[in-house]
UniProtKB/Swiss-Prot annotation:
Pfam family, one: Ribosomal_S13_N
Family matches, as InterPro entries: Ribosomal_uS15, Ribosomal_uS15_arc_euk, Ribosomal_uS15_N, uS15_NS1_RNA-bd_sf
Protein name: Small ribosomal subunit protein uS15
HAMAP family listed in its UniProt record: Ribosomal_uS15_A (MF_01343_A)
Gene: RPS13
CDD domains membership: Ribosomal_S15p_S13e (cd00353)
Organism: Brugia pahangi (Filarial nematode worm)
Length: 151
């Protein structure tokens, strides 16, 4: 898929392993991996950070192959899922940082333009998550309350 506000074609992608079974050298069971996921979530880590730690420290390449569920679904079952999806959270965080920058540097026209692009991505992603019912239908992005969402 191509990039949204960029001329790049977006061709490169990570290579997924062909075999969909659990590696024979992995010693962790499904219950142990789920326990690790909940333990890391209690520390305040986001799902992508949990996946990186499991990959680097414990050798779990893909949690879904071991447990049968994705990290977010495991967290949802335990009632620990983030209220805002992670990609939307990071876009809101970026918009808040750009706004903070613009308060100090009012003449920075390029940052003002980039803020418009980031906020259009936020609105598009929010519309997608509303149709998928991962966000309530009444949820709305407002720049005045955005800093409270990411703090």
């Amino acid at each position: 898929m191509g990039r949204m506000h960029n001329p790049g074609k977006g061709i490169s992608q990570s290579a997924l392993p062909y075999r969909r079974s659990v590696p024979t050298w992995l010693k962790l069971t499904s219950e142990e991996v789920q326990e690790q996921v909940t333990r890391l979530a209690k520390k305040g880590l986001r799902p992508s950070q949990i996946g990186v730690i499991l990959r680097d420290s414990h050798g779990v390449a893909q949690v879904r192959r071991v447990t049968g569920n994705k990290i977010v679904r495991i967290l949802k079952a335990k009632g620990m899922a983030p209220e805002i999806p992670e990609d939307l959270y990071h876009l809101i965080k970026k918009a808040v940082n750009i706004r903070k920058h613009l308060e100090r540097n009012r003449k920075d026209k390029d940052s003002k333009y980039r803020l418009i692009l980031v906020e259009s991505r936020i609105h598009r992603l929010a519309r997608y998550y509303k149709t998928k019912r991962q966000l309530p239908a009444t949820w709305k992005y407002e720049s005045s309350t955005a800093s409270a969402l990411v703090s």
